[in-house]
Amino acid sequence: MNMNPILRTKAALTALIWSLTSLLGWKASLTLVWVIAMALDYLSGTFAAMKNRAWCSETARQGLWHKAGMILVVLVAALTDGVIYLVGQRLGMGISYSGLVFPLTLSWYILTEAGSILENCVKLGVKIPSWLTKILKISLKSIDAAGESGADEQEESH
């Protein structure tokens, strides 16, 4: 079958999204939100830099490297959840685990990106409701507390 490049790209994206949804379930939606947040942060940062005549290819490149590092951290979080699940299931340790590290990490990064987007919007001259930034900070603290709580429980059990 000879598909044109646009159809081939659509088919590949559809297959990728279907595979992720099949593999990750509801976490695929969270992953998609994170990817969108990263893109919006990069775009809003670019717009803010251009508006303020401060755009620099080196800074843009550093931003992309930062995003690449975030992707690696999220992959480590997903692998961590996978290993904990497999060990609990396969070694008969009686651990019932559906994953905590991956969604918490994604949520933390989504809120961090949202905060960065708001900072970029301020640089664009947009007024931000103070309660919105407060909600983001409170939510980040809650995610940190949940992550720390889970880590503390693991340390205590050893």
Question: For the regions a protein language model found, what residue spans apply to each?
Answer:
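Mid-chain, well-packed structural core segment of small domains
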Residues: 66-106
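Membrane interface segments of multi-pass transport proteins and intramembrane proteases
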Residues: 54, 58, 88-96, 123-126, ...
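Transmembrane helix interruption/hinge and helix-loop junction motifs
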Residues: 23-30
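Juxtamembrane helix-capping/reentrant segments at transmembrane boundaries
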Residues: 52-74
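Alpha-helical transmembrane segments of multi-pass membrane proteins
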Residues: 34-44, 70-78, 105-116
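Membrane-proximal cytosolic segments adjacent to transmembrane helices
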Residues: 1-9, 111, 115-158
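Alpha-helical phosphate/pyrophosphate-handling elements in metalloenzyme active cores
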Residues: 9-22
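Juxtamembrane membrane-interface segments at transmembrane alpha-helix termini
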Residues: 43-53
